[in-house]
Amino acid sequence: MARFAGVDIPNEKRIVISLTYVFGVGLQTSKKVLAAAGVSEDIRTKDLTSD
């Protein structure tokens, strides 16, 4: 599992859903963060790179 803000987020879920496991991050916030970072909402957490 990946860790973000001290929270383990699931590898098999889409990143847009995985980010909602962080307290205070809902679906809309997750979408805004990904758009600002230029990351596709459809990518799986396990497929992310450190770039």
Swiss-Prot record:
GO terms for cellular component: ribonucleoprotein complex; ribosome. GO terms for biological process: translation. This is Small ribosomal subunit protein uS13. It holds the Pfam family Ribosomal_S13. GO terms for molecular function: rRNA binding; structural constituent of ribosome; tRNA binding. SUPFAM superfamilies: S13-like H2TH domain. InterPro entries: Ribosomal_uS13, Ribosomal_uS13-like_H2TH. Part of the 30S ribosomal subunit. Forms a loose heterodimer with protein S19. Forms two bridges to the 50S subunit in the 70S ribosome. Gene3D superfamilies: 1.10.8.50. Located at the top of the head of the 30S subunit, it contacts several helices of the 16S rRNA. In the 70S ribosome it contacts the 23S rRNA (bridge B1a) and protein L5 of the 50S subunit (bridge B1b), connecting the 2 subunits; these bridges are implicated in subunit movement. Contacts the tRNAs in the A and P-sites. It comes from the Bacteria. Keywords: Ribonucleoprotein, Ribosomal protein, RNA-binding, rRNA-binding, tRNA-binding. Belongs to the universal ribosomal protein uS13 family.
